[in-house]
């Protein structure tokens, strides 16, 4: 039974009737296209609504989970007990001189396009990353020798008590797929990037080149969460997996991509259980062969099926 239905009216008072969904299948909200139902899923349209929703959850001991595009997320088949707060409608972007300021739910691609229109370079590496900016900052997302830490100036965040404050670049403590936001369980509300002036064609050509390389090397035609594993120190996850003979390995509808071994894909009809079992299988086989521990880059949440 959904024990949080008693709070529906209170969430509707905060975010509006049309922005509260009950027993919502999470496969609709993740790039893996898997995942059981969330008890409640709400989509605030203002930062104040985010704050009020978090305070309501805190005051009533309701578990809550923040998601953006769901592009680096695997939700287990039993779904999520509590409230999912989706930042989909918090996507405002503005340009002020050489700075781009974006709300947490803004897709990285949209931010890159706004920077391009203003002849601002530095974010080209991020243009093909499918996530939203909040998640990208939280994990210091990167690709093709670029990462968020190189271009971020500050982030406005909220803590579990509803306090809103600004963190500068140093305070964000960004490392390889990590940040102070993860460490202290902050939630990103808004991000400021400091970019540099460049030529429109130079930026555009760089974006097109990186997108071409992505299309050639990554299985973009299948649902996935991007790179499944973090890069182990001194190794490349995809090479370890390939050298273990696991390219194309399948469990149910989940497969180690034949195009790029670092990606586990939903080949069709996969469950979250299939994907999790394949992740564990890959980790065990790589450990047996190379004594290297592969850690997942994808965020895994939710309950197992009963």
Curated annotation (Swiss-Prot):
What pathway does the annotation place this protein in? Cell wall biogenesis; peptidoglycan biosynthesis
Q: Which PANTHER family match?
A: UDP-N-ACETYLENOLPYRUVOYLGLUCOSAMINE REDUCTASE
Give the protein family: Belongs to the MurB family.
Top-level class of the enzyme under EC nomenclature: oxidoreductase
State the name under which the record lists this protein: UDP-N-acetylenolpyruvoylglucosamine reductase
User: Any idea where this protein resides?
Assistant: Cytoplasm
Report the main location listed first in the record. Answer: cytoplasm
Pfam families linked to this entry: FAD_binding_4, MurB_C
Cofactor names? FAD
State the EC number(s).
Answer: 1.3.1.98
Q: Does the keyword Cell cycle apply?
A: yes
Q: Where is the FAD-binding PCMH-type domain?
A: 34-198
Q: List the lineage, top down.
A: Bacteria, Bacillati, Bacillota, Clostridia, Eubacteriales
Q: Which NCBIfam families match?
A: murB, PRK13905.1
Report the function annotation for this chain.
Cell wall formation.
Q: SUPFAM superfamilies recorded for this chain?
A: FAD-binding/transporter-associated domain-like, Uridine diphospho-N-Acetylenolpyruvylglucosamine reductase, MurB, C-terminal domain
| Enzymatic reactions | UDP-N-acetyl-alpha-D-muramate + NADP(+) = UDP-N-acetyl-3-O-(1-carboxyvinyl)-alpha-D-glucosamine + NADPH + H(+)
Q: Name one GO biological process term.
A: regulation of cell shape
| Residues at the catalytic site | 177, 227, 297
InterPro entries registered for this protein in UniProt: FAD-bd_PCMH (IPR016166), FAD-bd_PCMH-like_sf (IPR036318), FAD-bd_PCMH_sub1 (IPR016167), FAD-bd_PCMH_sub2 (IPR016169), MurB (IPR003170), MurB_C (IPR011601), MurB_C_sf (IPR036635), Oxid_FAD_bind_N (IPR006094)
- What GO CC terms are in its UniProt record? cytosol
User: Which organism was this protein described from?
Assistant: Clostridium botulinum (strain Langeland / NCTC 10281 / Type F)
Answer whether the UniProt record assigns the keyword Flavoprotein to this protein.
Answer: yes
**Extent of the signal sequence:** none
